[in-house]
Amino acid sequence: MAKLMENLSLLTGEDGLIYMQYIFEVIQRMHKNTKTDRVRRMIKVGIIGATGYAGQELVRILLGHKYAQIVCYGSRSYIDKKYSDVFGNMFRLADSKCLDDNMEELADAVDVIFTATPQGLCAGLVNEDILNKVKIVDLSADFRIKDVSVYEKWYGITHKSPQFINEAVY
């Protein structure tokens, strides 16, 4: 359970956007605690929902971080299209192809997953196996509201992972 709580770094912010400072702190802390042959390595980042509004902002912020390496631009709408073809302002900055946003596969390939998705998606995908492999920073309200009945009334959907709410960091 302690391992689960350590890896459950779900954070959300007002209106679905997280604070830029927190993003930098997450990457900075992970980088500081990561050594490979006395050399610190880049933190591999995957973004689920990279082509939405919050996802675009997240890409822009992370591209400016010296220790973050975006290895997956997850998008259900633009699979196999270059991120820079979808967003011309990213020409020569983000030329990787958009991939399906499969959280299970992504958890094996990255150090941290950011989810920039509508309410309900992250809660429907996250499970203990994923949380034991990777840190997750969720931009939605899935783990922000601690009272499940308030969440369900406000968003009009059933919360799919209420067991993780008390462990989530907000």
Role assignments for model-derived ranges:
Residues 2, 12, 34-36:
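Ala/Thr-enriched low-complexity intrinsically disordered regions
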Residues 8-10:
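Short hydrophobic targeting helices and cationic amphipathic motifs
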Residues 18, 25-28:
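Intrinsic low-complexity/disordered segments
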Residues 24-26, 37-170:
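N-terminal Rossmann-like NAD(P) cofactor-binding subdomain of oxidoreductases
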